[in-house]
Amino acid sequence: MRPALFLCPVLISVLFLLSSLSLISGCNKALCASDVSKCLLQGLCQCRPQEGNCSCCKECMLCLSSLWEECCDCVGMCNPRSYNDSPATSKSTVEELYRPIPSLFRALTEGDAPINMMVVSFPVAEELSHHENLVSFLETLDSQSQNISLPTSSAQDDALCTVVYFDDCVSIRQCKQYCESMGGSKYRWFHNACCECIGPECLDYGSKTVKCMNCLI
């Protein structure tokens, strides 16, 4: 009985905090609810930095891991942000996938788009014409990979870059897993939690425009 009695106040406080997530400015409830509830249940994010108590800040940051930047608002631990800060949709993280399967990606993106996804194709030349402005990378890119030149042959000029957007918001871990399961070559995860899987014909990192139907903000 004692463990149950001990857990009741914790569960009540967690449920109260989760119910108020959508009221917290900047809190992405769709992305953060699961991880935040896990960390709260472990008692790792329950101190109050705004009241001068940051005794749990380090443990909370480690618990939220790669979602810290996106979810710290949900636990009241983000530094105050300027209204002039760039929106999350303008920031993204990219990574090359270890074992792409081009034939699988093409098969899944030809014809009608799968449920809960949107397939977009555009010229490779258009993909390479934009200067990348990424906030972070999951891997180190050497100087040569950052200075990509436009293709010169007419065949490459006519090539299309095909990408897939998932309709709903997902975590960066889910984004990587989904794109790997589709045989994608790379992925781009926008900091508003929109996921873009990038096909084998793309020479850079696809489009830097958010087009996830239910995850546009």
Curated annotation (Swiss-Prot):
Protein localization: Secreted
Single GO cellular component term: extracellular space
GO biological process: blood vessel development; regulation of BMP signaling pathway
Keywords: Developmental protein, Glycoprotein, Secreted, Signal
Carbohydrate-modified residues: 53, 147
InterPro entries: Tsg (IPR006761)
Pfam families with a match to the protein in the record: Tsg, Tsg_N
Leader sequence segment: 1-26
Claim: Glycoprotein is one of the keywords in the record: yes
Domain of life: Eukaryota
Record-stated family: Belongs to the twisted gastrulation protein family.
PANTHER family found in the cross-reference section: TWISTED GASTRULATION PROTEIN HOMOLOG 1-A-RELATED
Function: Involved in dorsal-ventral patterning. Appears to function predominantly as a ventralizing factor, through its actions as a BMP signaling agonist, acting through both chd-dependent and chd-independent mechanisms. May also antagonize BMP signaling, probably via formation of ternary complexes with chd and BMPs, resulting in dorsalization.
Protein name from the UniProt record: Twisted gastrulation protein homolog 1-A
Organism of this sequence: Danio rerio (Zebrafish)
